[in-house]
């Protein structure tokens, strides 16, 4: 529980360690919810896997 209280007021990205504390203000300019960020990252990963399967290395 102590860990949860420690990160209670923080941006979810900062609490997860995805960005540095000094960069927190920069993230606020991008209007993304944490759920949207996860969906976008999963879509990018899926796209890269599909490209790898369709276009084998030369």
Swiss-Prot record:
Keywords: Cell membrane, Membrane, Protein transport, Translocation, Transmembrane, Transmembrane helix, Transport. The chain crosses the membrane at residues 34-53. GO terms for cellular component: plasma membrane. It is a single-pass membrane protein. InterPro entries: Preprot_translocase_SecG (IPR023531), SecG/Sec61-beta/Sbh (IPR016482). It is found in: Cell membrane. Its main location: membrane. Residues 1-33 are cytoplasmic. GO terms for biological process: protein transport. Residues 54-58 are extracellular. It holds the Pfam family Sec61_beta. Component of the protein translocase complex. Heterotrimer consisting of alpha (SecY), beta (SecG) and gamma (SecE) subunits. Can form oligomers of the heterotrimer. Belongs to the SEC61-beta family. HAMAP family: SecG. Involved in protein export. The function of the beta subunit is unknown, but it may be involved in stabilization of the trimeric complex. This is Preprotein translocase subunit SecG. The lineage of its organism: Archaea, Thermoproteota, Thermoprotei, Thermoproteales, Thermoproteaceae.
């Amino acid at each position: 529980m102590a860990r949860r209280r420690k990160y209670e007021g923080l941006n979810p990205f900062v609490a997860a360690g995805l960005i540095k504390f000094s960069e927190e203000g920069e993230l606020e300019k991008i209007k993304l919810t944490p759920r949207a960020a996860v969906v976008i990252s999963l879509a990018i990963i899926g796209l890269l896997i599909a490209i790898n399967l369709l276009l084998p290395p030369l």
